Regions:
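Bacterial N-terminal signal peptides
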Residues: 5-16
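N-terminal hydrophobic or amphipathic helices and topogenic motifs
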Residues: 19-39
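Extracytoplasmic substrate-binding proteins
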Residues: 24, 30-31, 97-98, 102, ...
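Short helix-initiation/N-cap motifs at beta->coil->alpha
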Residues: 25-29, 80-89, 105, 209-218
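A short, structured surface patch at a secondary-structure boundary
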Residues: 39-94, 98-104, 205
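Short secondary-structure boundary segments
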Residues: 45, 103-104, 179, 209, ...
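His/Asp/Glu-enriched short active-site or ligand-binding loop at hydrolase and phosphoryl-transfer sites
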Residues: 65, 190-213, 233, 258-259
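Short helices/loops that flank or line small-molecule/ion binding pockets
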Residues: 88-95, 117, 215-225
């Protein structure tokens, strides 16, 4: 009888542990397992911080990299360095039970360092707009905040569906997206930004380049002759002013030089869908300018 009761007790403990453990696949295709909901999370990228808040885990983020400035509460999170150079001693002192890294912009050395802490590491790198709500759901599972994550994911998917319905059949607009001016670099078809552009009916003039964020020349942009040029408005980013001297470019002739908020387009977090809507609006302006000529 005692042996039977002991067996039942052990079975119950094993079942409980199995139910508590959660495993998801990260964007590197690796399994990430937490034995219980993560309560102390470290974010190694600004877009990751936004994803964690969107998943209902903002109060659980105990450390974040510089420029993690959204939502407002994120500004008060202790800093651990930059996405390329973290202070590993600060990370250790925070005693995290989950670390979320940026798959391509956090260096391999940094990821190896945090792995050696024995803490589960989720590598984040959303490649499409659809993967943003999916990322929210997976992070919500790891933190045990599924209800909040599901609500956010549902809303994001609804917004995406609305944009697709609105712009699915719009005429294409050949577009140059300028990330920085010195050096002049852009984003290729391998980036999530191009997925957003396609949703709007935009065609990235550097879609076929193999590098995600290639440096390009002014001459190559002039030769491609884009119908629209989009740059970002951050303090240290180059604007569209440099193109005004090139009157032969279609974007200049048609007054299709646009400036958007880079935080909404260069971070693969929930707000990127808002940024996509803004991009769609300016590309629609370009179509109207085309019709008016």
């Amino acid at each position: 009888m005692k042996q039977t009761m002991l067996a039942i007790l052990v079975a119950g403990l094993v079942t409980g542990a199995a139910q508590a453990a959660v495993t998801v696949k990260d964007d590197a295709g690796q399994a990430v397992t937490v034995d219980k909901p993560a309560l102390r999370v470290v974010s190694m990228a600004p877009h990751v911080t936004e994803l964690l808040f969107a998943a209902g885990g903002g109060s659980r983020v105990v450390g974040a990299v510089n420029y993690s400035d959204y939502p407002e509460a994120a500004k008060r999170i202790p800093r651990i360095g930059s996405n390329r150079e973290i202070d590993i001693e600060r990370v250790i002192a925070l005693k995290p039970d989950l670390i979320v890294a940026w798959m391509h912009n956090s260096s391999e050395r940094q990821i190896d360092l945090v792995r050696k802490l024995g803490v589960p590491v989720f590598q984040s790198d959303p490649q499409t707009l659809d993967s943003i709500p999916e990322s929210v759901l997976r992070l919500g599972r790891l933190m045990g905040t599924e209800a909040a994550a599901e609500a956010t994911a549902t809303q994001l998917r609804k917004q995406l569906a609305g944009l697709r319905a609105q712009y699915a059949k719009r005429p294409p607009v050949r577009t140059f997206y300028q990330v920085w001016d010195k050096p002049l670099y852009t984003l290729s078809g391998k980036s999530i930004l191009t997925d957003a552009m396609r949703l709007c009916g935009g065609v990235n003039i550097f879609d076929s380049l193999n590098v995600v964020a290639p440096i390009v020349t002014i001459e190559s942009v002039l030769q491609a002759n884009p119908e629209a040029i989009i740059a970002t408005a951050e303090k240290n980013y180059g604007g569209v002013e440099l193109w005004k001297q090139y009157g032969s470019v279609q974007a200049v002739r048609n007054k299709n030089l646009f400036t958007l908020d880079g935080n909404l387009l260069n971070r693969a977090g929930p707000r990127m869908i808002e940024g996509t809507a803004a991009m769609c609006e300016v590309l629609e302006q370009a179509r109207k300018h085309r019709a008016a000529r």
